[in-house]
Amino acid sequence: AIEVVAPQGRSGFLLREYLDDALGRGAAAPAYRLTMNLAENRYPRGVRVDNVANRYELVLVVDYTLTAVGGGPVKTGRIQSAVTYDSADQPYASIAAEQDGQDRAAAQAARQIQLDLAAWLAKRDAVAPKVPA
C-alpha cells in the first residue's frame, strides 16, 4: 500500500481522495509514502466582445516523490493535467464550473500518477521478482 500525503487546498484534497481510492488506502500497512507539490493555474481562453473571459483553462502540475518507508526516495515524477470550463455571468454558476474543473483536473492527474506508479512497480518487479514465501 501507499500512504498519500495531501497538499493543501481543494485540488490537493481532491487529488488525495482519488489516489487513496486508486491505491487502496487502509488495505495493508504502507510500504511507501507519496508526497506531492502542486501548482494550479487558470488561463482565460475565450473572451467575449466586452473583453471578459467566458472560458478558462485550468492547468494542474503535480511534482511527486515516492519514498520507501524507512528509506529514501525511490521514484519522482511530474505530471500535468489540463481541462477547460465555461464561466457564467452568475457567480454561483461560475464557482460551480470552476470547482467542476478542479475535480476533473484532479481526477485526471490521479489517473496519470496511478498509471506512472503502476508501470514503475511492474518494471521493478520484472527486474527483481519476489521470491514466494
Residue ranges and their predicted role:
Residues 22-27, 66-70, 112-125:
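Sec/Tat-exported extracytoplasmic proteins
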Residues 96-133:
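C-terminal/domain-edge helix-coil "capping" segments
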Residues 26-78, 83-100, 104:
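Surface-exposed short loop/turn segments
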Residues 1-28, 122-133:
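A structural "domain/chain start" motif
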